[in-house]
Design a protein with these regions (language model features):
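Periplasmic-side early beta-strands and strand-to-turn transitions of outer-membrane beta-barrels
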Residues: 91-170
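Extracytoplasmic loops and strand-loop junctions of Gram-negative outer membrane beta-barrel proteins
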Residues: 16, 35-36, 69-71, 123-129, ...
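Outer-membrane beta-barrel translocator/receptor signature
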Residues: 13, 29-31, 42-114, 135-139
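Structural motif
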Residues: 22-25, 44, 144
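A generic local structural motif
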Residues: 17-22, 84-86, 141-142
Length: 170
């Protein structure tokens, strides 16, 4: 079994994944992805003998943020008339480290090119110009506040993810 973690906390066991069971992790602001294989995964979670995938982000800063950083991204896809944007800010306000992020994804059904589906001679089927139920929508907002010092750090964060996935072939 493989478990997915976000900053060391269990998000989901891969055994329970499927097209209609997405992983509740916002991929905006990821710093690194850690892979832990085999028995050493027991340090992070029990029952994960297949390994651990730990997604590390910067929602709770472990060191003081020395400058204000704004990031803005946009992506467009032609196969499904999709768009994806994200905006985030990290900085220091009144001695507290602050991280705010929002991302949105809106993907329509996948287009099927003309003549892409080949039928046996004599067969007749309805022709679709798209793959039904292949659409997806996501909105994710993250907020993190932390305080650091010679003694270490503490922080709190919140993530709100609203996701809707179509399940093709169902």
């Amino acid at each position: 079994r493989v478990k997915v973690l976000n900053n060391g906390l269990v998000v989901r066991d891969v055994a329970f994944m499927g097209a209609d069971h997405p992983i509740e992790v916002d991929i905006g602001g990821i710093q690194q992805i850690e892979i832990v294989k085999g028995p050493s995964s027991i340090l992070y979670s029990n029952g994960a003998i297949g390994g651990i995938v730990n997604i590390v982000d910067n929602t709770i800063a472990k060191e003081d943020v020395l400058e204000n950083i704004f990031n803005l991204g946009f992506e467009s896809q032609s196969v499904n008339d999709g768009d994806n944007y994200n905006i985030d800010y990290s900085g220091s306000v009144e001695g507290l480290n602050l991280f705010i992020s929002h991302s949105s994804k809106n993907l329509d059904n996948f287009d099927i090119p003309d003549e892409a589906v080949i039928h046996e001679p004599g067969e007749t089927h309805d022709e679709f110009s798209y793959l039904p139920n292949s659409d997806s929508k996501l909105a994710a907002t993250r907020l993190g506040i932390s305080k650091t010092g010679d003694w270490g750090y503490y922080g709190i964060s919140s993530v709100i993810i609203d996701q809707l996935n179509g399940v093709p072939f169902h």
